[in-house]
Amino acid sequence: MDQITIVGGGLAGLTAAISSAEQGASVRLLEAHADLGGRARSTPAPYKVNLGPHALLSNSPFWLWLGERDLLPPHARPPLSGVRFRWRDDIRRVPAVGAAVAALRLRGRTAPVELDFRTWASSHVGAEAAETLARSAGILTYHHDPGELSAAFLWEPLVRGLLSAPPSARFPIGGWSAIVERMRGRAVALGVEIETGTRVSELPRAPVIVATELADARALLGDHSLTWLSGHSVCLDLAIRHRRGDPFVVVDLQETGWIERYTASDPSLAPAGEELIQAQMPIRPGESAAVATTRLERLLDAAFAGWRERETWRRRQVMDGRTGALDLPRKSWRDRPAVDRGEGVFLAGDMVAAPGCLSEIAWSSAVQASRLAVSWAAGRGRPAPVGAVSR
């Protein structure tokens, strides 16, 4: 069996490496950075912050896959209190009543691929409630107008990520690097050769799995068709001195922003007496990151009293095309760039043709790519289709 080369050591690359090695393949993984993890890397202490808001969903196949391999680190559940909502220029403890009722009325319905979420939801619960529901999805899309996305695309993560009871979100203690380290250990135990600090400028010999960001894959493969819609958002990572009464989460039902105080569930992420906050605001078309940052800071002003005077550390990031796939009406995950690129080249990542929500897309595409690559390496060509997960 030929050796499989994997380019990229993020969640998709590590999943592909583990899955390929479990099938008996010889695997070599190449990562350009000094550390594995990609966008799942956490910064080192004293402030262990992820690249944008991250959470695992305990109702996901990715969660089950990690658990079956003992790759789930200790994790925290979200607090049951401390959620606030920004609505009509006020910070509230309860959401807009219409939106809450709308969510209950929509439960159990199958959202269509052909319609945008705003049109579909409005036909069942009215325009105002539909708009409020759509704006709650800023954290899931990093998009300035979630309501224009496909109803089928938006409704599933809304139900699973925000409307499930009890909440399905889980937070790895110590940040996402805890997951990355366990996956690295599993790969090494399976005999995967890992080379970090190795930048790839030419496509390696097939079979190869390209598990990079889509823009990097486009350059490496020389294939300009490798594009898809993604989010555009500014993210502020802040450390502030503790103050009693700070909320855990702020859901912005006006401008699709989001604030999360991660130390509410995992105090180890910041030094004692400090809180680690991540806040994000989607950037509107034609808007600068500076203007979006100002809007985000106004949200912080409303929700975290005196945060500017309490600030001890700050990092600003602009995430453009790096937050996963977004599907417009009449498009589904099947229309995204295909995993199988032909001639023993396969693609994995969170913007390719694989089902799931958020990080599940990277995982499911990597599992599919590994099956195809192992079959190619063994000289069997293309295997019969096997569904990685159901949608």
Q: What is each model feature region?
A:
Residues 23, 198-289, 336, 387-391:
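Mid-domain catalytic core of redox enzymes
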Residues 4, 25-27, 208-211, 309-316:
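Hydrophobic anchor at the start of a short beta-strand
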Residues 105-207:
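Active-site/ligand-binding neighborhood in enzyme catalytic cores
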Residues 21-44:
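Glycine-rich FAD pyrophosphate-binding loop
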Residues 12, 35, 215:
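Conserved Rossmann-like nucleotide-cofactor binding loop
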